[in-house]
């Protein structure tokens, strides 16, 4: 065995580069962090050939003295910390002193820098870690670093780079995170000589709309919270604005982008049933806390952190997010693209880069209350101009669209039971007189269309009733006040072994809900009573369907028992698509929907309500 010897710096730097510089996006991240730490107010990012040919970052930061230039490309040389205690009070993004040494060892590297008060700057070049003597140079105040031919001397690393589209996607996501977290900085990005964006203002919503589509920024929920321990601020997406979890959830600790599973789970759980399966909400959250309470020196990439008290962080983030999303107006607003929409400057048409911009209609980012939309609905009775021909509102038309005026036998009687109060509109107004009720129709025995003050409201009748039944089931089980209707002829059901096992698991909760079921030998049970919402003759089918859905939810979603049972119960008992409703039934369903705590989404996260504004209709008909 050979004797132990210290590795030459050039070899050590290449080894270090394996962790610090994983791909071109890593270079972009490290150089931008240096620019921000230098106090830059303007940063330009220039990319060529997805970073293979060129990554260049230009800033107007403080720059460096000529004596510091050589030190900047040495390992473990930094201006950001000087002693071990500094690691507990980090106020900068960089601190390890590895980045420039690692980057310059695997590229053709050029650095130009000048302090604002100096007449000349300094130029330094490095060819794969072989550093040339720095030279005086004319340059702008600040620093410009150009990294060419990345991994030219490490063929294995260059070989394993992905396609240009994939590598540029990573670069773009990296830059986007900085652009969103540092709105006070002017950002410009060039890709293969094309300008992708140039943000001169500090409007975060404007930047979000650029990246995610027109109106996206205005449709977010703003979050702010502060106490003695930490601050929380940022933006959250509505359930209809689902995203890819990996790239469209941003968490910053003291403005440092981090990856943290606990924070992802806290946000996901705070949304709860507002999300459909395998969906994740958009999140841009900034957490501020004492640097001594978080360790960022976990990995050279500086994306992972360790909290001193992770449970306390979660116990603050979870309720803040939950409170924000539960008080927001989640009704979707329909949006239709204009026939000749202009191309947005800076879109990148790459196969693996998401360049298609979604359209989100502009509506207030501040949360509207349930009462706001309900008042809008009730006010719809007075919106029609008095000069409109009566023929347009002939009663025969309303009758045909609403599919009759009599309750159909298939609809649960409980829907019409006046036991639930109308939602409080919050203004003490008297109810609308029956002859002045808002116009309402049923479309294809599937959707309920209502005239509201600002346009139209469309409700999915099945998921609306699901929401009503779900909250009623939760309340009944929590209050331990079951309401059971005894069957004149009890029904015996033979269950499969797995069904009987599930039945035994949930039998106590079934009783709380209003099911009176007792074992009847072997794998059989006898249904003697059911809740009022269960349709006559469907008792056995409903029970078996509930057991099947409960089992599926338990396996996939890991739901709490009571929540799972309420979801299964509401889904199987709600009025179905294709079921005719009378005008009276539709009005009662709407009133009960708006009496729930969250009328905008069903228990599984699907939207219940869509609004179509008069302004949108005017645009569709070319009136604006």
From Swiss-Prot:
GO biological process, one term: mismatch repair
Keyword list, A-Z: DNA damage, DNA repair
One Pfam family it belongs to: MutL_C
Alphabetical list of CDD domains matching this protein: HATPase_MutL-MLH-PMS-like, MutL_Trans
UniProt entry tagged with the keyword Transcription regulation: no
GO cellular component: mismatch repair complex
Similarity remark: Belongs to the DNA mismatch repair MutL/HexB family.
Name by which UniProt lists this protein: DNA mismatch repair protein MutL
Higher taxonomy: Bacteria, Pseudomonadati, Chlorobiota, Chlorobiia, Chlorobiales
